Amino acid sequence: MSMFKDIPVEVGVIYEGERIRRNDMQVELGGPTVDKKFEIAKVKPMEQIEDGKVFVVGPDLKDLKEGGAYPLGILVEAAGAQLDPGLEGVIERRLHGYLNYIEGFMHLNQRYDVWMRLGKKSFQKGLNSFEVIGKVLYRLFKNELPIIEKLQITFVTDMSKIDELYPQALASYESRDAKARGLKDSEVDTFYGCVLCQSFAPSHVCVITPQRYSNCGAISWFDGKASASIDPKGPIFAIPRGEMLNEEKGEFSGVNEAAKKRSMGEVTKVWLYTAFDHPHTSCGCFEAVTFYIPEVDGFGIVQRNFKGAAVNGLPFSTLADSTAGGRQIDGFHGMSLEYMRSSKFFAADGGWNRVVWVPKEVKEKVKDFIPKDIVDKIATEEDVKSIDELKAFLKAKNHPIVAKWVTEEETPVSASAEDTTPVMTASTLPISAGGFRIILTDAKIYASKVVIKKEETKAEKR
């Protein structure tokens, strides 16, 4: 790109999806070990913007110790005759794509969950100042969003300044989110889709409706509408809702068509209001993961910044890997925290009556949206530490899910002894045969007959 001749590293879409491993990184900015980090966009009057200016408040990249993790705030301030505050979320989310265009720079997540890494090779080439990154962002914003007439960017690493700006950023996010509450999916004829994360999750198509925020928690239905209107060929696009195929599950013909087209046929059916059968795909930037707990037939939820293991013994990273990458995994669902405030929150699965465990921090954030008769019956990490403790807690609190256990226990099952005897059961069971190995963990398999055949190669057939 000719506009980047003075930049010491290459810039282009070819670098989207580039991962920078810990051993290869110069520094980490934000991420799971840093408490306060953010990126925010604000629309300002023309006279308040110094066009093209890049400010660095605090130590610059070259001043940061190699291998360290540091707090970072990014403030993008834009002005233009056609700009209004309703476009702030649109401008802000473009940071994800634009920063990933930079060779040797990785950007993940959004808002207060941002996680960035600068690679050693790019640092050694001269990408050693936020001013260089700011120049790239300025040119990309002005080139791809012409309605931005003036733009300035501020990078903040000074902790006292971050402490000042962080609560302001959180207040801005909440203000945007609140605007979208109240509007229903049934009241609009257009949803919106986003493929910003396809560089990391090729088959992921995020469907944004009034009652279902983007997985990352950064794009509301109003943000999607604004983005599609100013950049109709961009990564956020309109989806005609189409015919309602399944009201309970949240299946729409337009969503299915868009998912199939944008995922290159990998995803053909999406149910928006359930975590089972055809759940919404998960990217990698989601704020939280819902995971099914078969022992209690309920859902647990764990957010990205949760320290330690969830009630099932697994940390967020492992649970995230179980559903990320644009896949549809039964009982696993990457989602935004804002979706937990929606009346369509897993509506087909029982909604909050199906949730049994949530970290205290998340529970406090969404407490006002949990039905009052269930809020104290949902366990947190302070109440239970294991599945057995969770079972006892749910029984003691008379959680609605317990009634379902009783019903299932009392339902007569007609089956032969052959059907109900486990073929195998073990906490970890390795099976080796024919040159391959399968490891089953905490599995009980019931079957009347199991046949495993090794497929013959052409040479063997001859």
Language-model-derived ranges and their functions:
Residues 415-462:
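Compositionally biased, non-globular sequence tracts
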Residues 1-416:
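Cysteine-centered metal-binding/redox modules
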